[in-house]
Regions:
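Intracellular juxtamembrane helix-capping segments at the cytosolic ends
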Residues: 149-162
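Flexible cytoplasmic inter-helical loops of multi-pass small-molecule transporters
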Residues: 10-30, 230-231
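C-terminal ends and interior cores of transmembrane alpha-helices
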Residues: 116-131
Length: 231
């Protein structure tokens, strides 16, 4: 993977828009300072992206721990990992699908639709977390499909929130803050909720709150599909 990553990076070139900015001396020396006027865009990008990471860590980390250690009777770790390996295929497929449709229909249309579907999933899907291969596979496959739908367009809509001179800094900061907000504490929060309430459905309510925050942010973000980015 390191060799493949290095090969790809060595063969990548700067975008025409960035090269034009370099030629016109519009590249800033202190991008974080220049990013300050765009703090609203950073926050909107962070909250719009947050549910993606919450869903990822609930599906990929917390649910494994729950199925192996808490569920009665439990799955073995190998059994649950095998189910995750199969269901993650849906993640890859829906990244591809939603990338295509975000170019056709717009980023907001695809993301709002997928986030609404994630909200509905959050409210009902946790009931399927029981020792039943079919229901768990349904939970994982639908969950990873939704995560792919949320993750796919992020490479477009996050950079498109910002002008050229702070585009990478703004997108990178939003992306990584979303990872902290949505992902860093998701397994711990989920475990604490189940422990305190005794109900696995409480994890779904947590995901529903994150979905609502993402929806608010998405409604406030302007559609960017047809914007002129040479500015």
């Amino acid at each position: 993977l390191v060799i493949i990553g290095l090969y790809v990076r060595l063969r990548m070139t700067e975008t025409p828009i960035f090269r034009k900015a370099v030629e016109q001396d519009r590249v800033v020396k202190h991008p974080l300072r220049s990013l300050l006027p765009y703090w609203k865009e950073v926050l909107l990008g962070t909250f719009a992206m947050g549910i993606t990471y919450s869903l990822f860590y609930v599906l990929g980390t917390w649910s494994l721990s729950y199925a192996v250690k808490v569920m009665k009777p439990p799955f073995s770790q190998n059994e649950y990992l095998a189910m995750q390996m199969v269901s993650v295929v849906f993640f890859a497929i829906f990244i591809f699908v939603t990338c295509i449709y975000s170019d056709k229909l717009g980023r907001k249309t695809v993301l709002i639709s997928t986030t609404l579907a994630t909200l509905v999933f959050s409210l009902f899907a946790m009931q399927s977390l029981q020792h039943n291969v079919l229901t768990v596979m349904l939970f994982l496959c639908v969950g990873f499909a939704l995560m792919g739908g949320l993750f796919g367009p992020c490479g477009a809509y996050l950079p498109e929130l910002f002008p050229t001179h702070v585009r990478y800094s703004g997108a990178g900061l939003s992306y990584n803050l979303a990872a902290i907000l949505g992902g860093a504490f998701a397994p711990a929060i989920s475990t604490a909720l189940v422990k305190s309430t005794g109900a696995v459905e409480s994890v779904g309510w947590y995901l529903a709150v994150m979905s609502l925050l993402a929806l608010i942010a998405l409604f406030l973000i302007k559609e960017s599909k047809d914007e002129d980015y040479e500015k």
